[in-house]
Swiss-Prot record:
This is Cytochrome b. The keyword Nucleotidyltransferase does not apply. The keyword Repeat does not apply. InterPro entries: Cyt_b/b6_C, Cyt_b/b6_C_sf, Cyt_b/b6_N, Cytb/b6-like_sf, Cytochrome_b, Cytochrome_b_C_euk/bac, Cytochrome_b_N_euk/bac, Di-haem_cyt_TM. The cytochrome bc1 complex contains 11 subunits: 3 respiratory subunits (MT-CYB, CYC1 and UQCRFS1), 2 core proteins (UQCRC1 and UQCRC2) and 6 low-molecular weight proteins (UQCRH/QCR6, UQCRB/QCR7, UQCRQ/QCR8, UQCR10/QCR9, UQCR11/QCR10 and a cleavage product of UQCRFS1). This cytochrome bc1 complex then forms a dimer. Heme b b566 binds at residues 97, 196. It is found in: Mitochondrion inner membrane. GO terms for biological process: mitochondrial electron transport, ubiquinol to cytochrome c. Belongs to the cytochrome b family. It comes from Eliomys quercinus (Garden dormouse). Binds 2 heme b groups non-covalently. Its cofactor is heme b.
Amino acid sequence: MKNIRKTHPLIKIINHSFIDLPTPSNISAWWNFGSLLGVCLGIQILTGLFLAMHYTSDTMTAFSSVTHICRDVNYGWLIRYMHANGASMFFICLFLHVGRGIYYGSCLFTETWNIGIILLFAVMATAFMGYVLPWGQMSFWGATVITNLLSAIPYIGTTLVEWIWGGFSVDKATLTRFFAFHFILPFIITALVMVHLLFLHETGSNNPSGINSDSDKIPFHPYFTIKDILGFLLLISFMMSLVLFSPDLLGDPDNYTPANPLNTPPHIKPEWYFLFAYAILRSIPNKLGGVLALVFSILILALFPLLQLSKQRSMMFRPISQCMFWILTADLLTLTWIGGQPVEHPFIIIGQVASILYFLNILVMLPMASLLENKLLKW
């Protein structure tokens, strides 16, 4: 009798994806972030489901329903803060996962990479809409400012914004539809994750050396299941430390004030994981130009497979490219810092320089470093 794991139509798929999957023997801890993102998604869907049981998407009661969850629901405070900080964990893992893809040349799996970019946009949209739901000051004004950016689109902009709002301002209709989309998107993300994995398993995983590893593969289970479980434990430990010791560390105090359309907060800023893009948006004086720069700051990831001019896939043995990569990382951290600062000197000029460096690094410096290293190979 053959093993059910290898014959059952459904279990067979799981077996080929997580158990008997041939995996390069030398993949490092940087390859853990895919599974960690899966865990984050699972945590977010579960905690979100329980929050949705008690939340009301009405402008009059949304804020007090969140207060009710934190005060009156059994472990409601825990579920709420796990959901809020789970989003931060999600983005930390996302950024590291994308960074790994760039550093080790995994972006050359173009289908997997492009689905990943769509996933990134979907997760960002979900996080943005989720931030609006508690209906605090920053929720309301964040929603107003970000949706208003679409009015920069020529001719149809204003109509488009009012269509998204469901009226002439961010109000009940906006909150209700944002809740609906915030609920449905994670399930769309789950479906996209399956497509992402489908394309990945067509080619097999990359590895740190960037060299074909068909001659040295080992089964995913037990070697990498154990390795992934260690990652899960570290992630959950870090997340629960944040939730239980300083749950509001990454949040904005303004969001503990109920939304008031008549009172604008002094500094409107999104959650920390959007600050780099927000800094790029603010660094351009023209509205449409800023919106385009904002979109292209993420969309530029789609160009990475085309800008890979090196004869070597991975950056592991390319010190000049490594240098450019870490300059890019430092630049993104600088942009994140600037995004949270008020619009005044010297922050304006730092933001503008960092924004130029961001695009310059990706479009010019990294490809030139690759070409230079190709020349050095001939010496």
